[in-house]
């Protein structure tokens, strides 16, 4: 693997993967599913794969594991040329050993050119294990992807807390593997493929599994993660104190929204890092994003690029956030937020 940052180049040695005659030119997307529903990031990556295929002539395949996946398969058909389906009751919920047992031999046999997945908790656990097993390179937590005509993948990811970006390329080992942050790319709804579904026999031996998921429980009273929320209300340093986020919370309750924030407030210890939006935090793709007291630094706005509508409120008429907003209000958030909250409450009672 080769990493390039600015004008310097670092070479990372790895074991060479012995390529056989079965190496394919396919682009594979790990179609992660939860409770039978394919996660949005998989459709983002299938859309990227479709763009790559125009340049490389490759076919795009989704690899899907689980049980009772009829609806998941149906949702993937327009986005891929092939769907490799591995169904087994032991794969209903993700466990690293069950997924690795099934995916690693199949990938090693077919050797796709590229394998992409979401930088989710599952992807972050599975992909390093796969890369180690396959003795190939892996670029984690990427915020950009490109490909050359010869099929070489170029993966872009932040380093040092988002202070710099690295461009990573791969040597001859295959597949070229990367995980990508949610909401990095838009989903192309106009691909209109008609995938061939290929069922693959499961290699799972339940008696050999080290872990078993007994059940899943959703935490009571918690809001959606900001990467999945349709409405996100965020506060920045302009909030002035951590206790003032109570206003943001009240507004978010009225809107049934999730609460986001900036790196500055996280560094101050005002908010949790899980709510941070930006290149060193999370990308969001909300239908409505409301930014209060956020100046609009580049490391923040990189995380809102796929939001549909952006509303910004700041006292500074020259704040950079207004360059990215569909609607901007120059004013005092301490007056605007309570007034907006009350008006919304009244409107919802009518």
Task: Please report, for each region that a protein language model flagged, where it lies by residue.
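N-terminal glycine-rich FAD/FM-binding segment characteristic of electron-transfer flavoproteins
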Residues: 19-350
């Amino acid at each position: 693997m080769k990493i390039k940052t600015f004008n310097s180049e670092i070479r990372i040695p790895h074991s060479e993967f012995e390529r056989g005659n079965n190496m394919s030119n396919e682009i594979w997307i790990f179609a992660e599913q939860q409770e039978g529903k394919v996660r949005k990031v998989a459709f983002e990556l299938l859309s990227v794969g479709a763009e790559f295929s125009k340049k490389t002539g490759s076919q795009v395949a989704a690899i899907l594991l689980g049980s009772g996946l009829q609806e998941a398969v149906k949702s993937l058909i327009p986005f891929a040329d092939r769907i490799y389906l591995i169904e087994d009751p032991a794969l209903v919920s993700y466990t690293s050993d069950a997924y690795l047992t099934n995916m690693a031999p199949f990938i090693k046999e077919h050797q796709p050119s590229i394998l992409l997945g979401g930088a989710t908790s599952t992807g972050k656990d599975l992909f390093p294990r796969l890369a180690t097993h396959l003795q190939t390179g892996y670029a984690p937590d990427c915020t950009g992807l490109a490909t050359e005509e010869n099929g070489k993948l170029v993966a872009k990811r932040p380093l040092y807390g988002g202070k710099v970006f690295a461009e990573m390329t791969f040597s001859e080992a295959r597949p070229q593997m990367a995980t990508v942050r949610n909401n990095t790319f838009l989903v192309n709804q106009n691909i209109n493929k008609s995938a061939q579904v290929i069922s693959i026999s499961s290699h799972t031996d339940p008696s050999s599994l080290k872990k078993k998921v007994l059940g899943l429980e959703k935490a009571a009273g918690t809001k959606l993660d900001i990467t999945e929320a349709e409405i996100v209300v965020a506060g920045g340093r302009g909030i002035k104190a951590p206790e003032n986020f109570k206003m943001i919370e009240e507004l978010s309750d009225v809107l049934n929204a999730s609460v986001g924030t900036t790196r500055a407030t996280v560094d101050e210890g005002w908010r949790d890092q899980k709510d941070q939006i930006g290149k060193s935090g999370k990308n969001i793709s909300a239908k409505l994003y409301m930014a209060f007291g956020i100046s609009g630094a580049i490391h923040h706005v990189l995380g809102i690029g796929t939001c549909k509508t952006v509303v910004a409120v700041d006292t500074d008429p020259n704040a950079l956030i207004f360059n990215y907003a569909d609607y901007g209000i120059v004013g005092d958030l301490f007056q605007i937020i309570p007034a907006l909250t009350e008006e919304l409450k009244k409107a919802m009672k009518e």
